[in-house]
């Protein structure tokens, strides 16, 4: 079954709720349902029974809202927290939100299951000491493709950024900073290169490529690929791994120039109605069994050692979920470089899409 938003919400028992939870966000307690936890996250990003299990364990109620990309998440919090308790930004947006003063410092004493996290993820440059974020997944961006529709393996970003061979059959990410970082990798530059000349060069390339693009997608590239709307799409490894279980004609590759690495984190925004329950939820997600259930559902690599030990070999040895070290060596993390650079990315992307 296609893992679109409505199917996924149905699987976790929330199909009738929809995307807007403004009524739930108006308060933090629901009559006869216990305190409410308001979660703002990506689509297909919890286990099928994760939320029900937490509700039972904590005598609480979870409201889930979905965002399509980090830009949407940041915009929602720019003028203050509208009522969320836990959010799930990517590493560069953890940095951006922290600099904006939007994140609550975590009380590690209330998150003892952080002991399950691999030490490699505990002191990143974007959040030294993990003061405001807890690692949830890590991610590699590459190209998802339909094997029967392309000639060989699309092992270069050229296939999607600088070629008309698959005109009208290509999907690109809509998130400005990441698309321009990928453009820099294709040009042989560090991903975070953002000088005026480089941004202009990437913008011109994308404008030239735009007639060949079927869609700029908001984290639903796997759905486009599965439905046959595109044959090549820039997407995250976990999303493509999800649909590869449903269609053996689909595959994923990290281009030889290297991809973009990311680490999504669990954060509590300032002004959270229920920070105590938020800490409890984060600790619940970091339990080995609970984290393993999430990983089995969403197919992203886990930074949780206890969860990894519980996962089957099919997951642990899957090169889409865990690309080989030689491939990862060519990949880079993106970094928030300040509002001036971020605005330059966004303005350039606006011009590309308007061209």
Language-model features: where?
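Periplasmic-binding protein-like
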Residues: 139, 199-208, 214, 244-270
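A bilobed periplasmic-binding-protein/Venus flytrap-type ligand-binding module shared by bacterial periplasmic
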Residues: 144-149, 185-186, 262-275, 282, ...
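Early extracytoplasmic/lumenal segment of secretory-pathway proteins
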Residues: 29-96
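Mature extracytoplasmic/periplasmic domains
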Residues: 269-329
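Conserved C-terminal helix/tail region of periplasmic/extracytoplasmic solute-binding proteins
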Residues: 325-355
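N-terminal export signals
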Residues: 7-27
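Extracytoplasmic ligand-binding site segments that recognize negatively charged/polar headgroups
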Residues: 83, 88-229
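A ligand-binding cleft/hinge motif common to bilobed small-molecule-binding domains
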Residues: 93-98, 226, 232-249
């Amino acid at each position: 079954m296609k893992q679109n938003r409505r199917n996924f919400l149905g699987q976790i028992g929330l199909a009738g709720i929809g995307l807007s939870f403004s009524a739930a966000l108006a308060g933090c307690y629901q009559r006869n349902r216990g305190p409410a936890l308001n979660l703002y996250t990506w689509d297909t990003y919890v286990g099928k029974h994760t939320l029900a299990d937490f509700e039972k364990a904590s005598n609480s109620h979870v409201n889930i809202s979905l965002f399509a990309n980090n830009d949407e998440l940041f915009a929602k919090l720019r003028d203050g927290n509208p009522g969320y308790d836990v959010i799930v930004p990517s590493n560069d947006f953890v940095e951006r939100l922290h600099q904006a003063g939007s994140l609550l410092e975590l009380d590690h004493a209330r998150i003892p299951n952080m002991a399950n996290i691999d030490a490699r993820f505990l002191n990143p440059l974007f959040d030294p000491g993990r003061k405001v974020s807890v690692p949830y997944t890590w991610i590699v961006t590459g190209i998802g493709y339909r094997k029967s529709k392309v000639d060989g393996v699309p092992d270069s970003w050229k296939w999607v950024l600088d070629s008309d061979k698959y005109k009208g059959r290509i999907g690109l990410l809509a998130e400005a900073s990441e698309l321009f970082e990928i453009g820099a990798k294709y040009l042989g530059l560090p991903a975070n290169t953002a000088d005026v000349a480089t941004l202009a060069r990437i913008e011109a390339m994308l404008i030239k490529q735009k007639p060949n693009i079927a869609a700029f997608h908001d984290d639903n590239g796997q759905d486009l690929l599965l439905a046959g709307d595109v044959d090549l799409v820039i997407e995250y490894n976990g999303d493509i791994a999800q649909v590869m279980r449903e269609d053996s004609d689909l595959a994923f590759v990290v281009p030889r120039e290297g991809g973009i690495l990311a680490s999504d984190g669990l954060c509590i925004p300032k002004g959270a109605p229920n920070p105590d329950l938020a800490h409890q939820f984060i600790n619940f997600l970091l339990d080995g069994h609970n984290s393993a259930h999430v990983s089995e559902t969403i197919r992203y690599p886990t930074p949780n050692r206890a969860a990894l030990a519980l996962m089957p070999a099919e997951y642990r040895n899957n090169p889409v979920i865990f690309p080989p070290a030689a491939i990862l060596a060519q990949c880079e993390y993106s970094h928030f470089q300040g509002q001036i650079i971020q605005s330059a990315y966004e303005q350039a992307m606006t011009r590309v899409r308007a061209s």
